[in-house]
Each structure stands twice: as structure tokens, then as C-alpha cells.
A protein has these predicted regions:
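N-terminal interaction modules that seed assembly of large macromolecular complexes
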Residues: 10-74
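Intrinsically disordered, low-complexity segments enriched in small/polar residues
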Residues: 2, 113, 144-147
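Residues that form generic nucleotide/phosphate-binding pockets
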Residues: 28-31, 35, 78, 93, ...
Length: 154
């Protein structure tokens, strides 16, 4: 995973490959302070990752805090060993969960095994039907015609 870091208005950015050390982050912070005009926080301006849309979930991480950097390093290590299918599942899980912090992202990556991709399901009604027909939700046969399949997956 590659982070692009900047200061201020983001006219210049520098890459940081994760996992990284705090000394690497501090060095980039100092270099950016010299080349970026204007005042502003040291921040993540972009993320290149095999997990689509990851930037929106980690952009507020404060890399100058060692605990935040360690969390990002852990996330990077998780992603580095994921298969393509696991990365797709992770992308979907991030979009379906209420993710508002780096801790939420790490919790989600830790629960990847609880998610699955069901290719034949494209809407709520199909998901409800899939869950009932495949025994994920126990329902007596005589009640199936009366089920609200759209509401089942909620």
C-alpha cells in the first residue's frame, strides 16, 4: 500500500510505502514542510492500494502519532497477504459496514472470513430468497410464500 502525503493545500506530495517506520514519516514531514507553501496539517492526500476506495476510510489517520502509524502498518500487512477474492470482499465489507475510523477498518479486515460474495444476488429480494433457500435463515416450508424477502436481509 502506498500513501501520498502532503502539507497545506496539497500542491506537492511524497509517497510513503507501508509498512513504514516513524522516522520515515518524520523525514517526509520535514521535507514537505520545506517545499510546500502555505500552512496546514501533514496529511494523507491519496492512497494506492489493491483495495478500491480505501482512501476514504483512512484519510484522517494522523501518521505523526505512532499508534496510528502502527494501525496503518497492520492494515497494510493484512492487505499484502489477501487473495484477490479477499480484497473484493474487504472492499464490499467496508462499503456495507458503518466505517468511520481506522479502528473500524481494522475490525472489518479482522472479520473478512464472516463475509462472502454471492454472485447470483443483485438486490435485496434475491438476497432474502438466497438466505432462506440455502438454510441461512430457518423457515418452515409452509410460511415461505408469505415471507417479505426484501426485509429479510436487513
Amino acid at each position: 500500500m502506498m500513501l501520498y502525503l502532503t502539507h497545506g493545500n496539497g500542491e506537492e506530495s511524497m509517497p510513503l510505502k507501508l509498512p513504514a517506520s516513524s522516522s520515515q514519516v518524520e523525514e517526509i514531514d520535514i521535507r514537505l514542510d520545506d517545499i510546500c507553501s502555505g500552512e496546514g496539517n501533514f496529511r494523507i492526500s491519496d492512497v494506492k492500494s489493491s483495495v478500491k476506495g480505501l482512501w476514504q476510510f483512512i484519510r484522517n489517520a494522523d501518521l505523526l502519532k505512532p499508534k496510528e502509524l502502527e494501525k496503518l502498518n497492520r492494515l497494510s500487512r493484512h492487505i499484502n497477504v489477501m487473495s484477490e477474492k479477499e480484497r473484493q470482499i474487504f472492499t464490499g465489507a467496508l462499503l456495507s459496514e458503518s466505517v468511520s475510523s481506522l479502528d473500524d477498518v481494522l475490525r472489518t479486515v479482522g472479520r473478512i472470513r464472516l463475509y462472502e460474495i454471492i454472485p447470483e444476488v443483485t438486490c435485496d429480494r434475491e438476497l432474502g430468497g438466497y438466505l432462506v433457500e440455502h438454510g441461512r435463515i430457518d423457515c418452515p416450508e409452509h410460511l415461505k410464500p408469505y415471507l417479505d424477502y426484501v426485509g429479510i436481509n436487513v
